[in-house]
Amino acid sequence: MERIRKYADPPLLIAIALLLVIGVFMVASSSFTTGLTKYGDGTYFFKRHLIFLVVGLVAAGVCYVVPLKTFQRFAFPAWSLGMVLCAALYTSLGVNVNGATRWLLIPGTHIQFMPSDILKYASIFYTANLLVLHRGKRRKEGFLPIVTVIGLSVVIVMKEDFSSAMVIAISLLGMFFISGMNLAEFVSILSMGLAVMYFFVFRVPYRMKRLTSFLHPFDDIGNTDWQLANSLYAMGTGSIKGIGYFRSHEVFNRLPEAYNDFIFAVIGEEFGFIGTSIVIGLFALFVQRGFLTALKQKGLYEKLIATGIFLSIGFQAFFNMGVAAGILPVTGLTLPYISFGGTALVFVMAMSGILLRLSRKGESH
């Protein structure tokens, strides 16, 4: 264990590894029926998940060995690219899936990706750059440029991807807090956030309906509540021990995105309260070790990066599991490490490589 500690924090590494293993088994189970129905191959999604997992592991390895100064140098270009790609969602390149245009299609291919994933993590590095650059400065010198970046990052994706916008906002505000936010700045940001919420959510009827539908999950089962109602049914069916691996009933066209957005519900159905508790415990361990990793950093930049990464992944997991359990409105966010892989898994693995690097024992960053 001491030998491993030289390369990464063992509990953090174990939490990530176990979540990935759970993901492999659960994608195999939750996607089998859909793969067989759509493509005549029950292992279609499983095989693709393994490919993306391998790519993600390579990305994690690369990010683990690349010095943080390299990411610091390319933070602004990456953030700018993310902004441009998110803006491209409003063009013909944007792909509408389940009523939301969150995906971009690469011309000449069948490859789709969510540009918000690029912006989500690029924002962490660029905001960290600004917070370090303007350390000790306030208002016009430091406060306004930083808030502008946070605001632009959130607003550009909020129209089509409100849930990702919330993850970005929480992770960046967490970084701002760590850097020494005072009460006046907190009140200012809170006021601006409420104003944005008012114009983008409270004044848009269909968003308000989506935001509040979880309070009455069985009122409109044929429309907005279909996913949530079936998710709750799956969780309830699983009871304490679950009905068994590969025995889910909800994957038979009852629970849309069973291998993706609602894979936590399938875990609850097949492995019950015990299974979901294990997953929640592993994510709690991830957040706790991520927090400790951030605390032990000697440099402000490293502390901010670790904070942004563990908050982003941790809150995305919280939102996903909260939706499946019926305590949060439907978001469309995947469950990190576990949901069917794609570019989202690759990005999460890349960020995990950086977090593991920062967690190394005795390294001066």
Positions of PLM-derived features:
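Hydrophobic alpha-helical segments of polytopic membrane proteins
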Residues: 76-83, 139-156, 162-202
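Interfacial segments of multi-pass membrane proteins
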Residues: 131, 171-185, 249-275, 333-346
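Hydrophobic, glycine- and aromatic-enriched re-entrant/interface helices and adjoining loop segments
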Residues: 97-103, 112, 187-278, 298-305
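Hydrophobic alpha-helical transmembrane segments
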Residues: 51-56, 120, 270-288
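Alpha-helical transmembrane segments of polytopic integral membrane proteins
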Residues: 24, 124, 128, 204, ...
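Loop-to-helix entry and N-terminal half of a specific, functionally important transmembrane alpha helix
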Residues: 294-332, 338
